[in-house]
Amino acid sequence: MGSFSIWHWLIVLVIVMLVFGTKKLRNIGQDLGGAVKGFKDGMKSAEDPNEQIPQSTTTAEKTVDVQAKDINK
């Protein structure tokens, strides 16, 4: 009862193919592959220290002084 044999997995695969169809399964596989590739590319760029986002050194030229007033008079 612990492990399924190859025949169990083949029957499950046939049932899934009948329910979803091969075109739908292919689209799901492509979407999943694209997501994994995007994740790997993101992790690769995060590990590369040469490609860090430069820090902005500009300061605000204008400051706004706001005086709070009591609305409830």
Curated annotation (Swiss-Prot):
Q: Its biological function?
A: Part of the twin-arginine translocation (Tat) system that transports large folded proteins containing a characteristic twin-arginine motif in their signal peptide across membranes. TatA could form the protein-conducting channel of the Tat system.
Instruction: Supply the InterPro entries for this chain.
Output: TatA/B/E (IPR003369), TatA/E (IPR006312)
Q: Where is the composition biased (Polar residues)?
A: 52-61
- The principal location of this protein is membrane
Compositional bias (Basic and acidic residues) spans?
62-73
Region annotation (Disordered) ranges? 44-73
Q: Might you name a Gene Ontology BP term for this protein?
A: protein transport by the Tat complex
Q: Topology with regard to the membrane? A: Single-pass membrane protein
The entry's localization annotation reads:
Cell inner membrane
Disulfide pairs? Answer: none
Q: Where do the TM regions start and end?
A: 1-21
Q: Which GO terms describe its molecular function?
A: protein transmembrane transporter activity
State the organism named in the record.
Answer: Polynucleobacter asymbioticus (strain DSM 18221 / CIP 109841 / QLW-P1DMWA-1)
Q: Which HAMAP family match?
A: TatA_E
Describe the subunit structure.
Answer: The Tat system comprises two distinct complexes: a TatABC complex, containing multiple copies of TatA, TatB and TatC subunits, and a separate TatA complex, containing only TatA subunits. Substrates initially bind to the TatABC complex, which probably triggers association of the separate TatA complex to form the active translocon.
Going by the UniProt record, its keywords in alphabetical order are:
Cell inner membrane, Cell membrane, Membrane, Protein transport, Translocation, Transmembrane, Transmembrane helix, Transport
Q: Could you state one GO cellular component term attached to this entry?
A: TAT protein transport complex
Family recorded in the similarity comment: Belongs to the TatA/E family.
- Name of the protein described by the UniProt record: Sec-independent protein translocase protein TatA
